[in-house]
């Protein structure tokens, strides 16, 4: 545990993904996804792959999931980056391939006001996903909730009808970890 509830929540989530058997995360980095990106980079139990082009990243993750038979995490920053994942998400839906899509987002108070890299990411993938959740803005530690949410993401993506799930993570600034 650190003194930073955002990074503690991300660590609880990522560690639970690893304990549930997730072995790969494909990251299309951006500033808004910094907390999750750094957390994945620090874990030894999930191999991280960085792909700058979101569409290529999504199809790379799809290939990893198809070849391994296990869910693969796909992480991007806010805005149109999430939209670039749609073709691969659709393919994952129809091929029943487990993907766990994590999209970073602006907090609710910055949406609808013209803030940069802000689009409506709520259910952006429509009927292509098995489960959607908007993660609450993290203001205090709640490791149990993040562990349960990670477990649900894995189970929802690997259930009777495997396929993609989507969690939208709103982050407030500062996005870097607290020092000290």
Name the predicted role of every residue range.
Residues 1-180:
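N-terminal alpha/beta PP-like core and its mobile active-site loop of ThDP/TPP-dependent enzymes
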């Amino acid at each position: 545990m650190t003194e930073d509830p955002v990074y503690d929540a991300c660590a609880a989530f990522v560690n639970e993904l690893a304990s549930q058997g997730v072995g790969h995360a494909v990251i299309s980095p951006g500033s808004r996804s910094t907390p999750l990106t750094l957390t994945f980079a620090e874990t030894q139990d999930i191999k991280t792959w960085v792909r700058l082009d979101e569409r290529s990243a999504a199809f790379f993750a799809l290939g990893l999931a198809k070849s391994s038979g296990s869910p693969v995490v796909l992480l991007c920053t806010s805005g149109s980056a999430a939209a670039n994942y749609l073709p691969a998400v659709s393919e994952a839906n129809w091929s029943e391939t487990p993907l766990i899509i994590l999209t970073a987002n602006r907090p609710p108070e910055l949406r609808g006001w013209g803030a940069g890299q802000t689009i409506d990411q709520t259910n952006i993938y429509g009927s292509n996903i098995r489960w959607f959740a908007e993660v609450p803005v993290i203001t205090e530690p709640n490791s149990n909730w993040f562990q349960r949410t990670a477990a649900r993401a894995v189970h929802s993506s690997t259930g009777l009808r495997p396929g993609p799930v989507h969690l939208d993570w709103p982050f407030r600034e500062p996005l870097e970890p607290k020092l000290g």
